From Swiss-Prot:
GO molecular function: rRNA binding; structural constituent of ribosome
Recorded family membership: Belongs to the universal ribosomal protein uL15 family.
Name of encoding gene: rplO
The name this protein goes by in its record: Large ribosomal subunit protein uL15
Entry's Gene Ontology cellular component terms: cytosolic large ribosomal subunit
Origin: domain of life: Bacteria
Self-association and partners: Part of the 50S ribosomal subunit.
Native source species: Psychrobacter sp. (strain PRwf-1)
InterPro entries from the UniProt entry: Ribosomal_uL15, Ribosomal_uL15/eL18, Ribosomal_uL15/eL18_sf, Ribosomal_uL15_bac-type
HAMAP family in UniProt: Ribosomal_uL15 (MF_01341)
Biological function: Binds to the 23S rRNA.
BP-aspect Gene Ontology terms: translation
Keywords: Ribonucleoprotein, Ribosomal protein, RNA-binding, rRNA-binding
UniProt feature, compositional bias: Gly residues: 24-37
Amino acid sequence: MGLKLNELSPGVGAKKTAHRKGRGIGSGLGKTGGRGVKGQKSRSGSGVRRGFEGGQMPLFRRVPKFGFTSQMALTTAEVRLSELNKIDGDVVSVETLKAANIIRHDMKRARIILSGEITKAYTFKGVKVTKGAKAAIEAAGGTVEVTEGTEE
């Protein structure tokens, strides 16, 4: 039994037929076109805004506000040890991480976390390093230079 081009057809359910709304009773979507009868949702350009509950006090206003977003967290990037293998050279700083496209250019701080293997001895300057990552770095022969605000 060979495969013939003239016998090819798409699988069952692969092609759906288009719904032609408002084109007669037989289509199943005639007259009101699946919109029901009257009301705001049946009109063209209709719809209520997101979260609107018909005039009732909406959930997002019933629930109290809480917390805040730390701006420090928004400008601090987490870097895995395994990602450091992309860096040319032996010094790791925020600038070298940006140059190697490991962190975004709008990041001001970096934090090295223990995830993956480190294969080379690096010197870390001006970045935070977790305890586990520091142990792995020193085991690989690297050093971590502690500056103001980078100790964990």
